[in-house]
Amino acid sequence: MAKLSKRVKAFKAKVDRTKAYPFDNALALIKECASAKFNESIDVSVQLGVDAKKSDQVVRGSVVLPAGTGKDVRVAVFATGEKAEQAKAAGADIVGMEDLAESIKAGNMPFDIVIASPDTMRIVGTLGQILGPRGMMPNPKVGTVTPDVATAVKNAKAGQVQYRTDKAGIIHATIGRKSFTDEALKSNLLALIDALTKAKPATSKGVYLRKVSLSSTMGAGVRIDQTTLAA
């Protein structure tokens, strides 16, 4: 714990918290200080100009990151018949119906995301108290309740991330790993920013993209100068 504290102090000494850094400079700082022995994730926080307490200003959706996330995503699918076969062909790790539901109820959940065909929601709906708190309950707003389960599986495997404003109106997402090139991380961040911009609520007033910050798994955040994000 002492080593972590020392590293964080050294990082904070290099970063001016009142300053917004050009993307390349911010990323260089973050990578320099991401000295953990594992391949740390690169995370982004985006402060949106919304009132998250109002249901019509909750920003929620998903986006496929062009360079992926660097994570091997395990996908479970609720489907039957032809759709089940399509899900398997697309790379789903687990496909089932009542059997999958019973496995989940028993606490057996070796997967990261759950996708469901609309006609299976009578079964999936009984799992809300289990999947909901884990952020895995299928929802049409993020594309995990869909008749096209094959495409949903492919998107999940390709590096799709889901996003939703927290109570403070902030979006948190992982855009890659320390080992990614700067270009890959920037392309992923731009894809997320583009998706958030398109998802702007009609009732949102004033500046929408208020603040963008990057950090590594074990590091502090660095604010980004948004004018340096132009593709």
From Swiss-Prot:
Top-level taxon of origin: Bacteria
SUPFAM superfamilies referenced in this protein's UniProt entry, alphabetically: Ribosomal protein L1
Pfam families the UniProt entry points to: Ribosomal_L1
InterPro entries: Ribosom_uL1_bac-type, Ribosomal_uL1, Ribosomal_uL1-like, Ribosomal_uL1/biogenesis, Ribosomal_uL1_3-a/b-sand, Ribosomal_uL1_CS
Function: Binds directly to 23S rRNA. The L1 stalk is quite mobile in the ribosome, and is involved in E site tRNA release. Protein L1 is also a translational repressor protein, it controls the translation of the L11 operon by binding to its mRNA.
Family in the record: Belongs to the universal ribosomal protein uL1 family.
Name of this protein: Large ribosomal subunit protein uL1
Organism: Herminiimonas arsenicoxydans
Gene transcribed to yield this protein: rplA
